[in-house]
């Protein structure tokens, strides 16, 4: 009889999880924030995949302007395996952490001034499954892949909109940064293709927005050498020698090309002390409140507090320790390059905003410019500064395929280094204004 106990417990767990599938809740209070939230927050799960086995967790925040007509934006974080809470709390959401030494209590939340929710409704989605609070009810599920996750996101959106039909008429955009540069163009294609299938709920797809996007592994990595030279991190002599000896390929070097390998060692010695996310920021002790990256630790303290999980309506027992970025998450990176998807999206007439922090060395702006030029579209608004209060905030150009490229002066790999400038950039673009 004892052999039935584990099976009975498993059955009870399955029934519990099934009961909580496709749930949603309006959250009025959050631990760490004083008083009621000054915006409308909804959290919940949407089941996708076979028998809804993948339960995708989301945070939805209504626009503070006119939620009935303002755009609906899906925002994804990078990784893969980084929770979209990263975007909500650090980059473009209405809440942020007060940066102070952690004393064992719940970190303090404060309102921000740069939230994109001032002009858009935003869904922050934890994907792929296993990221953040998203989980699978099937412990034997296949390892997620980029293309498979894109299909899951499309399914999520159509189900979410079916449960929130008041947003079907809102213009829809997909967005994200970093590794989302691989995912978002594919998701746009999945949505576009799905809209052509009779009987599927229609999504009013308009375009997409990407910050410092990972696009093509070889191109992104190789462009770091050109960027380092332009930023005076390596000498002109080393740069010219690397170009001549390595032939522009610095990633998969022929092991017989020993001269190139030696030059790459010299390059590594020059840049090893540089913080690649933002080369202006010093490398520092992550446990020090003076370190910019210290804030990422606060989200771990906050999201792993039981009162926080209860407030967010996280289903008990579905996830272990919450990690902002689950770097151990297994994922099949089967999209080598998203450039072909950008090409197809351009042909289909979707708008796009591609922007880069000009001091980001992980995915340098020079590499992003290279793949944009490879699309071979004519320029309709030539390279020029874009301004905030009569000061140069970056540079921009627009192409005939409705693609706008912009740099953010002094910006890094993620939006949190220049949140105000990124917010103004987005607000102008989403409303159809010139930058």
UniProtKB/Swiss-Prot annotation:
Subcellular location: Secreted
Residues bearing glycans: 103, 305, 376
Alphabetical list of Pfam families matching this protein: Peptidase_S10
Expressed in which tissues: Expressed in seedlings, roots and leaves.
A GO cellular-component term linked to this record: extracellular region
InterPro entries xref list: AB_hydrolase_fold (IPR029058), Peptidase_S10 (IPR001563)
Residues of the active site: 178, 360, 413
Any GO BP annotation: proteolysis
Subcellular location, principal: secreted
Signal sequence, renumbered to the chain: 1-23
An MF annotation (GO) of this entry: serine-type carboxypeptidase activity
Domain of life of the organism encoding this protein: Eukaryota
Keyword Magnesium: no
Entry similarity comment: Belongs to the peptidase S10 family.
Name the record gives this protein: Serine carboxypeptidase-like 16
Organism (species): Arabidopsis thaliana (Mouse-ear cress)
């Amino acid at each position: 009889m004892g052999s039935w106990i584990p099976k009975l417990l498993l059955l009870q767990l399955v029934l519990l999880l099934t009961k909580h599938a496709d749930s949603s809740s309006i959250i009025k209070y959050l631990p760490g924030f004083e008083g009621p939230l000054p915006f409308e927050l909804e959290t919940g799960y949407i089941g996708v995949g076979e028998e809804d086995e993948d339960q995708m967790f989301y945070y939805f925040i209504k626009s503070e302007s006119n939620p009935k007509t303002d755009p609906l934006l899906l925002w994804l974080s990078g990784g893969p395996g980084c929770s979209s809470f990263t975007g909500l709390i650090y980059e473009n959401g209405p809440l942020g952490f007060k940066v102070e030494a952690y004393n064992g209590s719940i970190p303090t939340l404060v309102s921000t001034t740069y939230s994109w929710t001032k002009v858009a409704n935003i869904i922050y989605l934890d994907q792929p499954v296993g990221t953040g609070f998203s989980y699978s009810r099937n412990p034997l599920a296949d390892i997620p892949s980029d293309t498979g996750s894109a299909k899951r996101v499309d399914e999520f959106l159509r189900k979410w909109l079916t449960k929130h039909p008041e947003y079907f008429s809102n213009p829809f955009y997909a967005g994200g940064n970093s590794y989302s540069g691989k995912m978002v163009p594919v998701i746009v294609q999945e949505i576009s293709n799905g809209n052509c299938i009779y009987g599927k709920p229609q999504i009013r797809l308009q375009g997409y927005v990407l910050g410092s996007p990972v696009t093509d592994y070889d191109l992104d990595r190789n462009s770091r050498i050109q960027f380092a030279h332009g930023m005076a991190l390596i000498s002109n002599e080393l740069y010219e020698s690397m170009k001549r000896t390595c032939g522009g390929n610095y990633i998969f070097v022929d092991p017989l090309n020993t001269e190139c390998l030696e030059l790459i060692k010299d390059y590594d010695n020059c840049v090893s002390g540089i913080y690649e996310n933002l080369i202006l920021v010093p490398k520092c002790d992550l446990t020090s409140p003076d370190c910019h990256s210290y804030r990422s630790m606060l989200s771990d303290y906050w999201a792993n507090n039981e009162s926080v999980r209860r407030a967010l309506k996280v289903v008990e027992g579905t996830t272990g320790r919450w990690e902002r970025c689950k770097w151990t998450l297994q994922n099949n990176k089967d999209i080598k390059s998203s450039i072909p998807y950008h090409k197809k999206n351009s042909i289909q007439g979707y708008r796009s905003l591609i922007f880069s922090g000009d001091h980001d060395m992980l995915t340098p702006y020079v590499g992003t410019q290279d793949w944009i030029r490879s699309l071979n579209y004519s320029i309709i608004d030539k390279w020029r500064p874009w301004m905030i209060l009569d000061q140069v905030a970056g540079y921009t150009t627009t192409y005939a395929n409705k693609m706008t490229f912009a740099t953010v002066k002094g910006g890094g790999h993620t939006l949190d280094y220049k949140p105000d400038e990124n917010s103004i950039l987005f607000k102008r673009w989403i409303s159809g204004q010139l930058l």
